[in-house]
């Protein structure tokens, strides 16, 4: 998943 989506999900941002 994109960083932005991970931030929304509350997970660690993956680049």
UniProtKB/Swiss-Prot annotation:
Q: List the keywords (alphabetical).
A: Antibiotic, Antimicrobial, Apoptosis, Fungicide
On whether GTP-binding is a keyword of this UniProt record, the answer is: no
GO BP terms? apoptotic process; defense response to bacterium; defense response to fungus; killing of cells of another organism
The residues the entry assigns to the signal sequence are none
Task: Recount the UniProt induction comment for this entry.
Answer: Up-regulated by infection with E.coli.
The record describes the protein's role as: Antimicrobial peptide which displays antifungal activity and antibacterial activity against a wide range of Gram-positive and Gram-negative bacteria. Has antibacterial activity against the Gram-positive bacteria E.faecium ATCC 19434 (MIC=2.5 uM), E.faecalis ATCC29212 (MIC=2.5 uM), S.epidermidis KCTC 1917 (MIC=5 uM), S.mutans KCTC 3065 (MIC=5 uM), and the Gram-negative bacteria E.coli BW25113 (MIC=5 uM), P.aeruginosa ATCC 27853 (MIC=10 uM), S.typhimurium KCTC 1926 (MIC=5 uM) and S.enteritidis ATCC 13076 (MIC=5 uM).
Identification of the protein by name: Periplanetasin-2
């Amino acid at each position: 998943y994109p960083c932005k989506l991970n931030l929304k999900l509350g997970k660690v941002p993956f680049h």
